[in-house]
């Protein structure tokens, strides 16, 4: 019987293009030693590389078309209102539940998209997308529930989210808070690993992602937000945060039995700079795909919108006349609830005359189809024609580069069937856009934030890329080997099950990567694919009988998504 263990460390948002030089210089010695002693490669995320879809694909072993989670939010059934996604919406069993059923002891700490905490054969502390209600003690973020008291004693005051977001002059405060959060997660994980039995243990650190979103402009002289004096003063904060994580990993490795533990380090995606926004709903409005209600107030707001009365322009005025020139990244989101009635917004849309709209974080487009959307107008028989018309028009969008040369803004538009497969693929948006240059970010969910089609970005200074990292090390793993073909994020679950001697469900999209394993391990451990019929997870079925989140939790989750820059009104 296979008695080995698996430790998975998730480093949110990390890519090799960020950390390679630091590892070469031995500034991240723990990560470097894991690479030297094992296998590594880039890890291909889902597309779009959105956190909820990526982590869920990791822990289900399936593409989003088989688990049903595509974005930070989904449309509430029977309306155009968006609600945050959460784990009770996942329609496939997780790696954690599969291992639990097989009798393996499971530990899960701070993994995104695990709230509400699920019952496992072990313990779970939920992570990113847990509603920030202001008091974790009133939130169902642990299993078993009494684990809350235990981790509060270990950590002092356990938190999931940072207290601060970047403004001019607060970097030291921001980074200090990151240190606190990193240390808390490491200490809680170590406590659980020492005090509780586990065969599979997983910890995710999110600060590796947060610092990139907030402070990428410190690294990039070409970034529109680059400030040479600020960059020089804080040139080393990125490395210091990553070194704090690296030191924490070293602590974790000191308390495991390395002879019987396989270690996996992975990220859900990478990040890179964002210089410009493409305001997709503004384009859809200009081209007549979105219609505005013919009531006086909506028509007036539309006229004001065309003349530049928009949240984006008001924000720029605030910056221009700010005495202290404080760049508060989330100020607009905070104020928007107060002033939204003065700006053109989704309440002004005439859905009965709208053919297409964008609600996704990276510019996904839905056709307003009759019989599917509440006020759909496009006949199902005409859907393909409308999509093809949109594809042609979208790929014709132009911009000018820094030299004034005209360039394409959109490289490719894909239909959902080109990205997803499975019983829930039909629930995805209809069209997905890919930009021609990585520095562009497509805004879909921000309804009418600007009357400009393409403009300089503000807020988060980096956004997601598809290139994550994968490192594996341990008794079952080949040494000093680079995998020539980067695995996809949904392939990892199958390989983790194989490390633990568990048959792999046949409905997984991932297969065992034989190049990862030693010949001895392969010869002694048969690869077994179990013929199973995909079924909705028990958690999802139970969630249909009751609300997955309360109204207060939905509001809290949505507010946190805004603060993190993942959702805009």
Model-predicted segments: where are they?
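A long, amphipathic alpha-helix that forms part
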Residues: 175-197, 201, 211, 217-264, ...
């Amino acid at each position: 019987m296979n008695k080995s263990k698996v430790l998975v460390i998730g480093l949110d948002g990390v890519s090799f293009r960020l950390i390679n030089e630091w590892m070469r210089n031995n500034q991240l010695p723990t990560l470097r030693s894991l690479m030297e002693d094992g296998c590594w490669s880039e890890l291909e995320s889902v597309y779009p590389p959105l956190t909820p879809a990526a982590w869920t694909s990791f822990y289900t072993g399936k593409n989003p078309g088989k688990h049903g989670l595509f974005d930070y939010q989904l449309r509430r059934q029977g309306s155009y209102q968006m609600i945050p996604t959460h784990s009770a919406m996942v329609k496939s069993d997780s790696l954690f539940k599969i291992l639990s059923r097989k009798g393996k002891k499971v530990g899960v700490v701070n993994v995104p998209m695990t709230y509400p905490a699920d019952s496992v054969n072990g313990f779970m502390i939920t992570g990113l997308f847990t509603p920030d209600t202001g008091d974790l003690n009133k939130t169902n973020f642990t299993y078993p529930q009494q684990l809350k008291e235990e981790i509060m004693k270990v950590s002092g005051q356990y938190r999931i989210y940072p207290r601060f977001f970047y403004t001019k002059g607060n970097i030291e405060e921001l980074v200090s808070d990151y240190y606190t959060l990193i240390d808390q997660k490491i200490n809680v994980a170590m406590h659980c690993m020492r005090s509780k039995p586990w065969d599979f243990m997983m910890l995710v650190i999110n600060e590796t992602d947060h610092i990139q979103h907030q402070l990428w402009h410190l690294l990039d002289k070409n970034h529109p937000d680059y400030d040479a004096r600020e960059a020089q003063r804080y040139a080393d904060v990125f490395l210091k945060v990553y070194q704090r994580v690296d030191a924490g990993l070293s602590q974790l490795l000191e308390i495991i039995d390395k002879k019987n533990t396989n270690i996996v380090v992975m990220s859900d995606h990478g990040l890179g700079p964002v210089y410009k926004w493409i305001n997709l709903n503004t384009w859809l409005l200009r081209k007549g795909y979105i219609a505005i209600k013919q009531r006086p107030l909506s028509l007036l707001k539309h006229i004001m919108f065309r003349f530049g009365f928009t949240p984006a322009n008001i924000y720029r005025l605030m910056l221009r006349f700010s005495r202290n020139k404080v760049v508060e990244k989330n100020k607009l989101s905070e104020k928007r609830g107060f002033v939204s009635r003065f700006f053109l917004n989704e309440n002004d849309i005439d859905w009965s005359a709208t053919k297409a709209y964008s609600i996704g974080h990276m510019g996904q487009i839905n056709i307003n189809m009759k019989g599917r959307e509440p006020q759909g107008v496009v006949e199902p028989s005409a859907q393909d024609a409308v999509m093809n018309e949109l594809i042609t028009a979208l790929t014709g969008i132009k911009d000018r580069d820094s030299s004034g040369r005209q360039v394409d803004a959109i490289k490719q538009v894909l239909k959902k069937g080109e990205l997803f497969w499975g019983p829930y693929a039909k629930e995805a948006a209809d069209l997905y856009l890919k930009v021609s240059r990585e520095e562009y970010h497509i805004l879909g969910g921000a309804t009418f934030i600007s009357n400009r089609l393409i403009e300089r970005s503000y807020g988060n200074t980096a956004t997601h890329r598809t290139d994550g990292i994968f490192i594996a090390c341990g008794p079952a793993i080949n040494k000093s080997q680079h995998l020539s073909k980067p695995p996809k994020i949904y392939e990892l679950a199958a390989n983790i099950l194989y490390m633990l001697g568990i048959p792999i469900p046949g409905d997984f999209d991932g297969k065992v990567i034989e190049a990862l394993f030693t010949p001895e391990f392969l010869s002694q451990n048969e690869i077994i694919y179990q013929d199973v019929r995909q079924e909705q997870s028990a958690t999802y079925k139970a969630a249909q009988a009751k609300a997955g989140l309360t109204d207060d939790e939905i509001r809290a989750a949505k507010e946190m998504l805004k603060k993190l820059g993942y959702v805009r009104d």
